[in-house]
Amino acid sequence: MKQLFSLLCFLLAATGIWADGHGPVFGLATPTNSKGEWSFDTGLFGRANDLGSEASLRALVGYGFTPHVSLFLTAPAVIGDLRLSPTRIQSGSDFEATVKWRFQHRATKVGTRIESTLFAGVAAPGPQSGFDDLVVTHAPGTMFGAVTGMASRSHYLWLGATFTKFYEHSGSKRPDVLDYSLVYGYRPARWRRSADRWDWRVFAELVGEHSDRFLETGSPVPQTQAHQLFLGPSLLGIYRNYTISFGAQASIYQGLGSLYPKERVRFAANFSYLLFQHSH
């Protein structure tokens, strides 16, 4: 735990590293990159249970082909080797390519807009995505999802879900994962700043994950199903083309198979640099 805390402090102090600066750190949101905008991201996503902690470092590159269509590529590296339920929050230990299409972008009044975004992608389990005592395939999966919501100068509200289906290989299969989230954000008037000063907003994030059982030699593995809910705050700060966000969540519901220790806390820190930024 001390090593993970030291690593987090190092990342918070570092310069020249990036993360996803478009919204909350755990839940889904509608923003995409602007046309011609590159985003360069680095993030830390951690999980802790009764046996210790594990963290996933990720690098992400995004590009906006149009004001509403973006492509994102993610590569992770895992620190630790705990037995934890499957997760698709911030890709976990999976390599991923995702296309986002913001198909609804409607202004209802000055400073307020309604948006909806669709997701489609491919996930490939990395070399660190194994599971003790099980024959786990690294066959890829496909992901589809959607998120909708409202954004104004002061308030944000997003509701969304994604479903990732992994494919069977030689009788083995990883669990399919459904994740869903509800996010509320608030940007107080006193926190609003011009582009040359830090501009902050706070989020309350509710995230749920449901996964079915592993498949081994063609048969479901007992006690490997999972359903969890997490709730917690996060902060997002924007300064010119740089953003920083961080947060933590506590478990509020756990329906886990006996193969998994109870997960207590999740934490995340994200850093982002946006190049050729345009308005959304």
Show where each model-derived region lies:
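Residues that define the transmembrane beta-barrel architecture of outer-membrane proteins
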Residues: 53-57, 90-95, 114, 136-142, ...
